[in-house]
From Swiss-Prot:
Short sequence motif named PP-loop motif, residue ranges: 44-49
Cofactor(s) needed: Mg(2+); [4Fe-4S] cluster
Family: Belongs to the TtcA family.
Organism: Nitrosococcus oceani (strain ATCC 19707 / BCRC 17464 / JCM 30415 / NCIMB 11848 / C-107)
Designated name of the protein: tRNA-cytidine(32) 2-sulfurtransferase
Cofactor binding note of this UniProt entry: Binds 1 [4Fe-4S] cluster per subunit. The cluster is chelated by three Cys residues, the fourth Fe has a free coordination site that may bind a sulfur atom transferred from the persulfide of IscS.
Principal cellular location given in the protein's record: cytoplasm
Protein residues bound to [4Fe-4S] cluster: C119, C122, C210
Pathway recorded for this protein: tRNA modification
Protein's job: Catalyzes the ATP-dependent 2-thiolation of cytidine in position 32 of tRNA, to form 2-thiocytidine (s(2)C32). The sulfur atoms are provided by the cysteine/cysteine desulfurase (IscS) system.
């Protein structure tokens, strides 16, 4: 092995260790996986869900808690969908899996006018089917492959177009109250997952088989973030850190903070502010390393 090959192998191992560490941190911080859990890992055939399954399988061997997992793919009968790819890949890994066949494609095409975005209806149908599958399989958690950039994109979409400060939480209770959904890749950057997918040579299935128009709002947000990341290295890390450092007393939601009940007091007030001072931020703050929670105990994997 020559010097260039050794360097490439070193970088690949370094990336793999970093992704495993970040997933372990997310699992620990949000108590995503508990002893005896049965995870339903949703596998779409995209880079993120492949990486999620790969990393969870690796961590499963060394985790301090015992858990089972089963990979689930929803075949929505989109024309041209390569039905053999996922079964062949999963069987090569020896992973338990379930392919759920539901022709939601025809339903969506019948309901949504030609040329319109089908993603919203498609996702609602998919969610209902996957919830039902989780119950059938006895899954205690549903694992999705959303990463840090997805979380930030959703935050800006909701703020710019929905008028709400809401992101995509690493762990949530489903709308029907019967399922816990986890996102173990919450601390992982998309560009790292792209590199990882290339190194692992995952058999990627295109995501545009349905022929739907791209979500233009999300594409605009993605382009904005990509430009920021290029022009201001570290800005995305700072923004993600902000989602973990919320101060309701310094926002304007009276349902989260009792503004009406504020009273003067003689002693210093921890949530007080210097009302007449302008906020000053150091330029170096945008170059700070990623933040993944303070004073947390990280799951250790060998």
């Amino acid at each position: 092995m020559n010097k260039q090959s050794r360097k490439a192998q070193y970088n690949a191992n370094k990336l793999q260790k970093r992704l495993r560490r970040l997933v372990g941190q997310a699992i620990e911080t949000f108590n995503m996986i508990e002893d005896g859990d049965r995870l339903m890992v949703c596998l779409s055939g995209g880079k993120d869900s492949y990486a999620l399954l790969d990393i969870l399988l690796s961590l499963q061997k060394h985790a301090p808690v015992k858990f089972d997992l089963i990979a689930v793919n929803l075949d929505q009968k989109q024309p041209g969908f390569p039905e053999h790819v996922l079964p062949h890949y999963l069987e090569s890994l020896g992973v338990s899996y379930r392919i759920v066949e539901q022709d939601t494609y025809s339903v969506v095409k019948r309901v949504i006018p030609e040329g319109k975005t089908t993603c919203s209806l498609c996702s609602r149908l998919r969610r209902g089917i996957l919830y039902g599958t989780a119950e059938e399989l006895g899954a205690t958690k549903i694992a999705l492959g959303h990463h840090r950039d997805d979380i930030l994109e959703t935050f800006f979409l909701n703020m710019f177009h929905g008028g709400t400060l809401k992101g995509m939480p690493p762990k949530l209770l489903s709308d029907n109250g019967r399922h816990i959904v986890i996102r173990p890749l919450a601390y992982c950057r998309e560009k790292d997952l792209e590199t990882y997918a290339h190194l692992k040579a995952f058999p990627i299935i295109p995501c545009n088989l349905c022929g739907s128009q791209a979500n233009l709002q999300r594409q605009a947000i993605k382009a904005m973030m990509k430009a920021w990341d290029k022009q201001f290295p570290g800005r995305l890390e700072t923004m993600f850190r902000a989602l973990q450092n919320v101060k309701p007393s310094h926002l304007a939601d009276s349902t989260l903070y009792n503004f009406q009940g504020l009273q003067k007091q003689e002693s210093p007030f921890p949530e007080g502010d210097k009302a007449f001072d302008e906020e000053v931020f150091l330029e170096s703050q945008e170059k700070s390393p990623p933040f993944h929670g303070s004073k947390i105990r990280v799951l250790q994997f060998k």
